[in-house]
Amino acid sequence: MTTQKSEPTPSSAQWLRRFVNVEPGEITALLASFVMFFTLLSAYYIVRPVRDEIGVSLGKDALHQLFTVVFVVMIVLVPLFGFVAARFPRRLVLPSIYIFFALNLVGFWLAMRTDGRNVWVAGTFFVWASVFNLFVVSLFWSLMSELWSHAEAKRLYGFISAGGTAGALTGPLLTQGFIKILAPVDLLLVSAFLLTASVAAGFIVRRRKSGGGAETDAAGGGILDGAIKVFTTSLFARIALFVFLANIVGTFFYLEQARLVASTIHDSAARVEFFSGRDLAVSIATFLIEIFGTARVLRHFGVTTALLALPVTAAIGTLLLSFDAALWVVAAVMVAERISAFSLANPAIKVIYTLATPDEKYKVQNFIDTVVFRGGDATSGWLYSSLSGGLGFAASSMGAVALPLVLVWVWVARRLGADHQERAAEASQAA
């Protein structure tokens, strides 16, 4: 991979190196990657309050059905994405899909402006937003794993991830600012603008990292290659199982928290304050760890340690929940779990993908990030509903039920780390 020579001035480069171990020729591409993820998640976190408000207005029963629809839509979209990835040059896949989603936002804006109370429009937007989030983030990391090498990823993915966290913090602030002068539906246009800006940053990243070169051919292969490789390749099967278990356990904590909040905090404004305070704590801690800690953990302690941080945190959380099923316990566990997921486990998995082939980076990663991810959500929802409703398990018993899953998750993390080491060694020898 080559880089062009136009880079920031020495003084700005020296300032940046205080936070990240970046080489002189990588600075522009790194900053563009940061900005790309920043604008992408800012766009989503502007859309999310609109989606959540629609969810509340549609009601609890409709939400359960909509999440099932989201999972089905994910399954349908996988072969369509496989077709696009197989037939079109990789340099066009991401910008084309991002622009398509931006046009969708404009379309929803027009529809909601015309008939904002239409249940079908509202339900469709809720499903769309849930799909949009996973697809655009998955495509972003596919691009990153294509353009950054394995060694570069260990040094730089923490900083790039911090761009997304900064976007997650900025999006709600932009919403609070714009909502004073715009109607809620007009926020969709702001989101569309930021998504388009993310495309522009993506072009800069690719140009700087590939030098405008030839790493842009279509991935080729069949439309279901991603799904097939997940079930036939041990490395990808373990990544999928890791993500699946992470979502089962994470959704379990989420649903238990929702139950405790409903029974403990009865004022709507107080609930909003509780959730916003939790999210703010997660975002600030995650940002600081991504800037100052993620790269150090990946380089000095390895991918396995970063992967283990998440299931070990969850294991401690389930034990605490077994002894004291209080709201503050669940909230503290969720904060710790999300911090370890965003700042350590997720970057570690993205590092593993840098060792994959171009075909795998797009098709396999997208299948796991969408279908497997939402499959974990759906499974956890049904499992939690069965245990708490049909079988009448108490909250303390629920923690004990989740513990075996978490222990399996720890084992999967260790095996996944070992698989990564083997593939990294093979790649090093081949080089």
What are these regions (language model features)?
Residues 99-118, 312-326:
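C-terminal ends and interior cores of transmembrane alpha-helices
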Residues 305-344:
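C-terminal transmembrane helical hairpin of 12-TM major facilitator-type secondary transporters
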Residues 28-81, 121-179, 218-229, 238-294, ...:
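Substrate-agnostic recognition of the 12-TM MFS/MFS-like secondary transporter fold
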